[in-house]
Amino acid sequence: MKEYQVYLERARSRQQDFLYPLIFREYIYGLAYSHNFNRSIFVENVGSDSKYSLLIVKRLITRMYQQNHLIISANDSNKNPFWGYNKNFYSQIISEGFAIVVEIPFFLEKSSSLEEAEIIKSYKNLRSIHSIFPFLEDKFTYLNYVSDIRIPYPIHLEILVQILRYWVKDAPFFHLLRLFLYNFSNWNSFITTKNSISTFSKSNPRLFLFLYNFYVCEYESIFLFLRNKSSHLRLKSFSVFFERIFFYAKREHLVEVFAKDFSYTLTFFKDPLIHYVRYQGKCILASKNSPFLMNKWKHYFIHLWQGFFYVWSQPRTIHINQLSEHSFQLLGYFLNVRVNRSVVRSQMLQNTFLIEIFSKKLDIIVPIIPLIRSLAKAKFCNVLGPLISKPVWADSSDFDIIDRFLXICRNLSHYYNGSSKKKSLYRIKYILRLSCIKTLACKHKSTVRAFLKRSGSEELLEEFFTEEEEILSLIFPRDSSTLHRLNRNRIWYLDILFSNDLVNDE
């Protein structure tokens, strides 16, 4: 962060807050290499035709200074000598430069907004993606309806650039960014297909994710404005939104649009209890009130995406379900609200009568079928469940093979320990345990039974089931009833920053 600040202040003193000159600075690409962002493009690859090194970056910067090579039209982009024969190579280099440069001011803005160390400490546990589940356990039992929404895509790259312009004021920088996108994303029509976006996101992951996150942030900022206008209660907690250029003008225009189109509905659309949760491209909207108000939110979202972001979205893609009757998927878990009925006998004077008590509880379940599909895709078993070995690991030592399987089992157990039903998790552990035994038997060219009898590895493989209990026993006494109760109840770990590779959240 300090390096960012030094380099940006040096450029500000010369160019008055413009980002465009930073594209031609070699230290920008040095930062990308030294900080080891997603994937480094500056290490030499012997198996490739191009040598990824800082020397090539320096030559690229020199050629970018030649303005006659940058005058490119959409029709002759493939013939321009600037890009040469290796288009993907230049795409990676320039994309990395754009991503680093455009992230600098927002890193500085975020760091300046969190000046006190206590503020950072207080939000430390909230970095975990599992910190959302205690919130859901506390709030969702009082709600009745839930809407499972997937943020629509693909969005045209021009819309992404226009959204970014509200944050950064630098016309030459965006001119060069458009030039880059025109030449590397086949930006020939306003209709953007999923295949073209997928190709661009794979070849330029950091830049694409940065632009996509701005799209989501813009959508959520408008949603936050609508939520505050439609609720009697003030919002107590919200994410930090950076100040943007022309935001207030856009907001006034948005008020005029909604006042004109929804003048009869906005006046009584008051939802005092509504909760919104998002992870990546999926969001969940839950409310206590009638489905009529949820339908209003549904149409607001559709009009917002189609009229403001020019993204096609159909009403049938947004489902509104009753929490007590339907489950929804979030972060690899299945969630639903279970209604428990209990009968209490009460007596008053000479009369006795029965009282029915209904209580709600949020069930968080491991999705066993999607997990088995993920294990089958990773070649641990087939889709029906029978075990197969991992022959690609047969060249490793026995200790390395066992350690690999234990690490996978440990990560899954760590991730899914918040489940209210642990039997499904034990089935996954059992599949991994037998797959490990079968891989070891395949390596030694023996049957599973003969291998276990000869090597006595059965006791060693018990770690698949006992490791989690040993960790809990370090915290609680072994002879206490607390340990047995924790094995059955949910335990959320607040150190999980991303979902497991085997988690299927489709």
Curated annotation (Swiss-Prot):
One of its GO terms (molecular function) is RNA binding. It comes from the Eukaryota. Keywords: Chloroplast, mRNA processing, Plastid, RNA-binding, tRNA processing. It is found in: Plastid, Chloroplast. GO terms for cellular component: chloroplast. InterPro entries: Domain_X (IPR024937), Maturase_MatK (IPR002866), Maturase_MatK_N (IPR024942). It holds the Pfam family MatK_N. Transmembrane segments: none annotated. One of its GO terms (biological process) is tRNA processing. Usually encoded in the trnK tRNA gene intron. Probably assists in splicing its own and other chloroplast group II introns. Belongs to the intron maturase 2 family. MatK subfamily. HAMAP family: MatK. This is Maturase K. It comes from Medicago sativa.
